[in-house]
């Protein structure tokens, strides 16, 4: 089998690795660098990728950076006189990585394992897979970045049982995963994250500071000058990196713009203390996902054996100190944070080809999945942090008599009401035979494959007719939305519970009215008029309460109706039992007569 390369398709930088024997090796790019900037530029119809594209970003406005942040959305970028989807731009980066991997290996590369942030949703994962296809790669597996990092870290520790926390702060995303390692099994216990937090945000804080200081001194807003802004971005990134090794750095940008008196220059010094102050809120945001992942995994900090740092942004001293303070542990520095994800992806490629033996990777889905049910309730079928691949089915029914079709509204999120979660897709199951509500049996099945990509099937168990959909959303879940889902779920827990209680009560009332009306109709002319009249009276009162919308009144009248309906049901049961006993008595008498007749024997009498 041909080699399967491992690719870390990052926001700011990407890397490619391959398994050589039992070792995972990073492949250097044509410029000798072990990581490649995730930058694409267009010049005179030529596509330029990587270091060369990044170098000309200041002077070439047709340069695309951080395209990963747009994956899974319908947003396009304009360049080279065309409009490109995020998948197409990402494919250009993948093609470049594939090309120099082929040069190194001396053979054609057709298959890859590509990593994504653990908190990437279905649309973003599908977009990544599509980008691979456009680049001419068969994507054998989509692997979560922290999981790939754990795979690379733990490959030489398969005889050791330990629980690790992977802290992955990259250029545009942040993930935390808790894994249990032992006997070659890499089991993800929980994952959490913030898809709108990364090194780019730290750069932006410096840019905003420089723009504000320059405006204060010169009265000119550099953020309105596209070329000046690109120079500021480059300077901010360099300053951030410098401050990981020194306590102060000088930012010098001559001829940044021109004023009425002539050219203006930006000269400023930035201390690590000032940088820490500017980015304090970003560092603070890393703490919540750490706590969330630990809580979901059901572990305390004392049960974590190692903390692994992944992503270039974990070199920021304030981030390292925050990790120490939050976990109470010195981070393990045995892996290269820029390379470990691609190396883990290559190891997974080796698992697929059979070159790596006795390794099992058990990943999870980051958010709950389900459908909208009556009253706008979000009914979960698969909970977050469920090991994938997985499949779950549940039977639902119709909400009205003779309902010919059901709409299946597929959602992703953590809130109890459908409106507060993210729509992944909708489809319809039609031609349901006419029947009273609650009679048709509609089985809804969710499947999540090994790549975390969702497919949903609805089947009428009566007719065996089914509809199937692979979720392909054009506007995937944004980073803010994922973060908001988790935070809103906590902040609005009380309000959510109340709203759900209201919907549940209304559904219960609706069901009770339907069932009681049916019982009253079925018992017409069968006696026990007293109980029927009492049930009818309670039914009328509940309908009036339902009309008024008063929840307390509805609750009280529902209890009263249940009591009267129960009394009617008891009478029906007693009548049925009496009828059954009477029937059994009649059968018994008939059997006795037959038995008595059997005792009579005809015989001859002889007189002596």
Curated annotation (Swiss-Prot):
One of its GO terms (molecular function) is unfolded protein binding. Induction: By stress conditions e.g. heat shock. Residues 580-598 have a biased composition (Low complexity). The keyword Nucleotide-binding applies. Residues 599-608 have a biased composition (Acidic residues). Residues 580-608 are annotated as: Disordered. The keyword Nucleotide-binding applies. The modification Phosphothreonine is found at residue 173. Keywords: ATP-binding, Chaperone, Nucleotide-binding, Phosphoprotein, Stress response. It comes from the Bacteria. SUPFAM superfamilies: Actin-like ATPase domain, Heat shock protein 70kD (HSP70), C-terminal subdomain, Heat shock protein 70kD (HSP70), peptide-binding domain. InterPro entries: ATPase_NBD (IPR043129), Chaperone_DnaK (IPR012725), Heat_shock_70_CS (IPR018181), HSP70_C_sf (IPR029048), HSP70_peptide-bd_sf (IPR029047), Hsp_70_fam (IPR013126). Acts as a chaperone. Belongs to the heat shock protein 70 family. This is Chaperone protein DnaK. The lineage of its organism: Bacteria, Bacillati, Bacillota, Bacilli, Lactobacillales.
């Amino acid at each position: 089998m041909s080699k399967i390369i491992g690719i870390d398709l990052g926001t700011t930088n990407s890397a490619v690795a391959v398994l050589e024997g039992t070792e995972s090796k990073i492949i250097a790019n044509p410029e000798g660098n072990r990581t490649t900037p995730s930058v694409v530029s267009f010049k005179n119809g030529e596509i330029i990728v990587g270091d060369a594209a990044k170098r000309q970003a200041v002077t070439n406005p047709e340069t695309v950076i951080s395209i990963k942040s747009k994956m899974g959305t319908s947003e396009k970028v304009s360049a080279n006189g065309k409009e490109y989807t995020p998948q197409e731009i990402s494919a250009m980066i993948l093609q470049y990585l594939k090309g120099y991997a082929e040069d190194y290996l001396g053979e054609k590369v057709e298959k890859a394992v590509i990593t994504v942030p653990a908190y990437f949703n279905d649309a973003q994962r599908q977009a990544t897979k599509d980008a691979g296809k456009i680049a001419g790669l068969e994507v054998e597996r989509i692997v979560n970045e922290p999981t790939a990092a754990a795979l690379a870290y733990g490959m030489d520790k398969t005889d050791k049982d330990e629980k690790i926390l992977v802290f992955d702060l990259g250029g545009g995303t942040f993930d935390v995963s808790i894994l249990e390692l032992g006997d070659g099994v890499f089991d993800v216990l929980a994952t959490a994250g913030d898809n709108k937090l990364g090194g780019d945000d730290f750069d932006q804080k410096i840019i905003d500071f420089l723009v504000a200081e320059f405006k204060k001194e010169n009265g000119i807003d550099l953020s309105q000058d596209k070329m000046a802004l690109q120079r500021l971005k480059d300077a901010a990134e360099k300053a951030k990196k410098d401050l990981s090794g020194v306590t102060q750095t000088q930012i010098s940008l001559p001829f940044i713009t021109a004023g009425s008196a002539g050219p203006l220059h930006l000269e400023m010094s930035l201390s690590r203390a000032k940088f820490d102050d500017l980015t304090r809120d970003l560092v603070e945001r890393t703490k919540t996902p750490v706590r969330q992942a630990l809580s979901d995994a059901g572990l305390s900090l004392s049960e974590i054996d190692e903390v692994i740092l992944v992503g270039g942004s974990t070199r920021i001293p304030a981030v390292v100190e925050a990790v120490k303070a939050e976990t109470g542990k010195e981070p393990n520095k045995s892996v290269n944070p820029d390379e470990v994800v691609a190396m883990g992806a290559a190891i997974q490629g080796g698992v697929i080809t059979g070159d790596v033996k006795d390794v099992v990777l058990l990943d999870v889905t980051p958010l709950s999945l389900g459908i909208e049910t009556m009253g706008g309730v979000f009914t979960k079928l698969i909970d977050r942090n469920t090991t994938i691949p997985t499949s779950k089915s549940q039977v639902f029914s119709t909400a009205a008599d003779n309902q010919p079709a059901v709409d299946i509204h597929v959602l992703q999120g953590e809130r109890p009401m459908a409106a507060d979660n993210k729509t992944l897709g909708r489809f319809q199951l039609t031609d349901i035979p006419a029947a009273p509500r609650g009679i048709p049996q509609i089985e809804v099945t969710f499947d999540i494959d090994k790549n975390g990509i969702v497919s949903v099937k609805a089947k009428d168990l009566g007719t065996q007719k089914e509809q199937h959909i692979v979720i392909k959303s054009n506007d995937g879940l944004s980073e803010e939305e994922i973060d908001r889902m988790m935070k809103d779920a906590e902040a609005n827990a009380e309000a959510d519970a109340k709203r759900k209680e209201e919907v549940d009560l209304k559904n219960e009332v609706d069901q009770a009215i339907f069932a009681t009306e049916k019982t009253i109709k079925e018992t017409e002319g069968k006696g026990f008029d007293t109980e029927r009249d009492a049930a009818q009276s309670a039914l009328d009162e509940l309908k009036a309460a339902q009309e008024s919308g008063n929840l307390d009144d509805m609750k009280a009248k529902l209890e009263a109706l249940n009591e009267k309906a129960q009394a009617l049901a008891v009478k029906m049961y007693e009548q049925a039992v009496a009828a059954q006993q009477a029937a059994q008595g009649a059968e018994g008498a008939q059997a006795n007569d037959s038995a008595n007749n059997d005792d009579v024997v005809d015989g001859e009498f002889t007189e002596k």
